[in-house]
Swiss-Prot record:
Subunit architecture: The complex is composed of two ATP-binding proteins (NikD and NikE), two transmembrane proteins (NikB and NikC) and a solute-binding protein (NikA).
UniProt protein name: Nickel import ATP-binding protein NikD
Protein's organism: Shigella dysenteriae serotype 1 (strain Sd197)
Gene name per UniProt: nikD
ABC transporter domain mapped to chain residues: 2-241
Keywords: ATP-binding, Cell inner membrane, Cell membrane, Ion transport, Membrane, Nickel, Nickel transport, Nucleotide-binding, Translocase, Transport
Keyword Cell inner membrane: yes
One GO MF term attached to the UniProt entry: ABC-type nickel transporter activity
Pfam families: ABC_tran (PF00005)
Reported function: Part of the ABC transporter complex NikABCDE involved in nickel import. Responsible for energy coupling to the transport system.
Localisation: Cell inner membrane
The keyword Magnesium belongs to this UniProt entry's keyword annotation: no
Membrane topology according to the record: Peripheral membrane protein
EC numbers for this chain: 7.2.2.11
SUPFAM superfamilies, A to Z: P-loop containing nucleoside triphosphate hydrolases
Amino acid sequence: MPQQIELRDIALQAAQPLVHGVSLTLQRGRVLALVGGSGSGKSLTCAAALGILPAGVRQTAGEILADGKPVSPCALRGIKIATIMQNPRSAFNPLHTMHTHARETCLALGKPADDATLTAAIEAVGLENAARVLKLYPFEMSGGMLQRMMIAMAVLCESPFIIADEPTTDLDVVAQARILDLLESIMQKQAPGMLLVTHDMGVVARLADDVAVMSDGKIVEQGDVETLFNAPKHAVTRSLVSAHLALYGMELAS
């Protein structure tokens, strides 16, 4: 399994250019946070890495490399990169139970799909009464439960890399804290490389090792999390950090 995945000079276009020469490097055991405002190109960049660009959007430049060798996004998706999506409800077939979803995921990746394996993954993400959960349909579960189920699926994949696209969006404070606890636990136990897409600098401060800031389809600043919080250089970064500090009655040093 690869130890590093690199997005190199990725450019995306629809009727007009959307993402301009984005380069990111994911390393096993480290969390890279990709931050920026809505429409900055974060989710499109993730879609390019997974080979799931929306209709009308095409990649016009750049490549993806695994341990320095060019690779197709389709060869990475699922096997080498697990995904935790922004809207978990849209990721599940409403006609299938959680048992069917989990079992089919495992079988597609050649992983064990016995009930004991599925139950262990569900219990690992804090969902009580795994036997009952496996019988549930998506409409019978809350957003927080579905997000935890998404994380359970990522655990089942045993992929060396994870892309988590706004994993705490639209969840209440308690559910957000639980999801962050789970992501932290995965990093400690499995040490994948994680691309964490978020607009919440509190999430960045808690989980990230490195940060890349996007604005208007470009990476405008990139570095380790401590340096970025203590000495942000770009105006967009300074704005994000200042807004976060203001929540605690603090100000960014001049």
